[in-house]
Amino acid sequence: MYPNGLFGLDALRVLISPIAIFGIIFFILYLRNDHIRAGRAVLLLLAIGVFALLGAKLFSLHVRGWEVYEPLSSELRGGLRYPGALLGMILVGPLLKRWILPDLPLPRFLDVLAITVCFCFALVRFSCFMNGCCTGPECDAIYCLSYEPGSQVWYVQLQQGLLDHSSHPSNPVFPLHILFMAASLGVGVFLMWFDTKRSFNGQIGLLFLILHDGAKAILESFRVPYVGELQLTSLSISAAGLVALIIVLYYRRVNSA
């Protein structure tokens, strides 16, 4: 899916290990005052990462109608979708935490995991920038990017008959992946700041669902080719987070009255 990229690198496979290491270090340092067991935290995050990748791959296959890339090795180069990764973490993460790191309260775990995910996905978006995926419509402004043959945007334009020859690079496209990156980074910075002002453990996790997936849902409107299931899933997750936050705030207000 991403054979060449902007600098001739398969950036996803190059960056996945450094991103994982960054996420583990960030998570442990963020909770250093909670005196968590670092070894168990590493094991927990690695296990969650496996299920996140599995969820991202399954969601990608679902969106593609369960069609596998040819050759099969191309599946290792990409074909991952964020909503599947998030759903995998939400469904399996609490259970894994209970088994591996039971001393850390679940709501606090979800708060810090949410902040960690923001920064990790901002780094993942750099691989999108390198490889030419998650782009917007064609444009001719100075900030628009053209990608080498073999990139996702090149494949799409070739299939649509927009390129004169298969040896030509893609037509310039809007760098939507940079906005995705900025959204993840911005939400992460805000959540770190708000974490010091939170009213209860778990609030940051709910705000993450609302803000991060809400922003992603808006940006999905400009993706080319547009994938409705990606936008609908992000909207649903954001709405579910908003409903959950309203319910929690209501019950907290009732109980404090």
Protein language model regions, located:
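Hydrophobic, membrane-interfacing alpha helices
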Residues: 1-257
